[in-house]
A protein has these predicted regions:
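Conserved active-site alpha-helix within GNAT-family acetyltransferase domains
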Residues: 120-124, 129-155
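C-terminal "cap" of GNAT-fold acetyltransferases
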Residues: 149-187
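Active-site rim helix/loop that mediates acceptor-substrate recognition in acyltransferases
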Residues: 15-78
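A conserved beta-turn-beta hairpin within the catalytic core of GNAT-like acetyltransferases
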Residues: 82-92, 102
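Short loop segments at secondary-structure junctions
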Residues: 70-71, 100, 163-167
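Conserved acetyl-CoA-binding loop-helix of GNAT-fold acetyltransferases
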Residues: 92, 97, 103-116, 127-128
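A short beta-loop-alpha structural element at the N-terminal edge
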Residues: 2-14
Length: 187
């Protein structure tokens, strides 16, 4: 497996990664008994989110990575600029692994690469809204333990922070993602 920075020509493969990784959420949300021809599901919101993030000032190309297996992109992660009050910090997400490559350590490899790269750039911390059983294995803990809360109260239960080497305990307050996280998906 190779973890490398995202390149310009990777866009379609990255869209396919997030389409595969998050399609189950759409399928389960739209499940039910229907008659008639199958209607294709729309792209998961993560596909459009990555596209909008690329066009935003918070996009950080040095912290956007893909995982390749046999020259095939099977995973993607991006870190973008966020803020806690006046302090610049990072937000993780989305992170996705194609369903045919899951349970092979791809997600863990992407997480370790992203954390290491952010730490090497002297970033103080990374925030995310994510699964409480997955992210603690990478050192994430509830943001409230460090006095950091998301600016959307309904995110609080799954909001987590990973302090890095440059972390300063003065960083407290409300966490704000890059603007595209708050925009509805394009039709």
């Amino acid at each position: 497996m190779l973890i490398r920075r995202e390149r310009t020509g990777d866009t379609a493969a990255i869209d396919a990664v997030h389409r595969s990784a998050f399609a189950d959420h759409l399928a389960s949300a739209g499940s039910g008994h229907r008659s008639g021809p199958a209607v294709p599901l729309p792209d998961p919101p993560e596909v459009d989110l990555v596209r909008r993030l690329r066009d935003h000032s918070g996009w950080m190309p040095t912290l956007t990575m893909v995982a390749e297996l046999h020259n095939d992109i099977v995973g993607h992660v991006c870190l973008t600029r966020a803020a806690v009050g006046p302090f610049p910090v990072l937000a993780l997400g989305p992170i996705g692994v194609r369903t045919d490559a899951q349970a092979r350590g791809v997600g863990s490899a992407l997480m370790h690469a992203a954390l290491g790269a952010a730490d090497a750039l002297d970033e103080p911390l990374i925030g995310l809204v994510g699964h409480l059983d997955y992210y603690p294995r990478f050192g994430f803990a509830p943001g409230t333990r460090l006095g950091i809360v998301p600016d959307q109260s309904d995110w609080t239960s799954h909001f987590q922070i990973r302090p890095l080497t440059a972390y300063d305990s003065e960083i407290k307050g409300e966490f704000r993602y890059a603007d595209p996280f708050y925009c509805p998906a394009s039709p």
